[in-house]
């Protein structure tokens, strides 16, 4: 697995980087991407150019949960989900909550929107381990995950929990 965590505004627009990412895709490997919510339009450009490979958007596109600003993120996630080569990773959301507010109820609108846009066939679960332990910990994230997946059919839950990751990462 290879991950692009975008720090500089124009880093992912670098031609050499994009060509190297395409080489990763040419051998059947997926590529994880992590963009800030203000960079999701750039993520879409990146995904369009790398359309012959699987890209996995980490942390549901890093929604601005702490601020509660859902509108722009929602539009951009919807737009990004229109590209069939992009999968959304359900991970790390508790880290984006305001201090003391990380809970299922807090992340639910963002999870629901991600599921609505990508559907259970294009979502994968991630533990965000060991970073998750800086917050409420892996046990709490697993508990929240069980609540999220408990709202889905068994087949949908299995896809998100493991089957999609097995398919995309070929594990």
Give the positions of each predicted feature.
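Distinct, well-ordered alpha-helical segments
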Residues: 9-14, 37-51, 66-79, 101-112, ...
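C-terminal helical cap
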Residues: 92-96, 100-109, 158-169
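Short, well-ordered coil/turn segments that N-cap beta-strands
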Residues: 27-30, 51-55, 82-86, 119-123, ...
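Conserved, mostly hydrophobic/aromatic
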Residues: 24, 59, 88, 128, ...
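Active-site environment of divalent metal-dependent phosphoester hydrolases
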Residues: 5-6, 38-42, 62-65, 94-97, ...
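Active-site gating/metal-coordination segments in enzymes
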Residues: 1-38, 45, 89, 93, ...
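Mid-to-C-terminal alpha-helical segments outside catalytic/metal-binding sites
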Residues: 113, 117-124, 133-171
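Aromatic-lined glycan-binding groove of carbohydrate-active enzymes
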Residues: 71-93
């Amino acid at each position: 697995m290879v991950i692009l965590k975008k720090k500089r505004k124009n880093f992912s627009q670098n031609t050499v980087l994009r060509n190297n990412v395409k080489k990763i895709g040419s051998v059947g490997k997926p590529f994880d991407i992590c963009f800030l919510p203000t960079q999701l339009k750039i993520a879409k450009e990146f995904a369009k150019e790398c359309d012959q490979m699987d890209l996995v958007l980490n942390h549901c596109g890093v929604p601005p949960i702490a601020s509660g600003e859902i509108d722009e993120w929602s539009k951009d996630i919807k737009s990004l989900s229109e590209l069939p080569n992009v999968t959304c990773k359900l991970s790390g959301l508790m880290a984006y909550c305001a201090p003391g507010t990380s809970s299922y109820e807090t992340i639910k609108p963002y999870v629901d929107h991600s599921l609505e846009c990508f559907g259970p066939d294009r979502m994968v679960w991630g533990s965000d381990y060991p970073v998750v332990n800086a917050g409420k910990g892996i046990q709490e994230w697993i508990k929240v995950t069980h609540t999220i997946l408990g709202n889905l059919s068994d087949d949908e839950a299995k896809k998100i929990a493991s089957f999609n990751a097995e398919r995309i990462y070929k594990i």
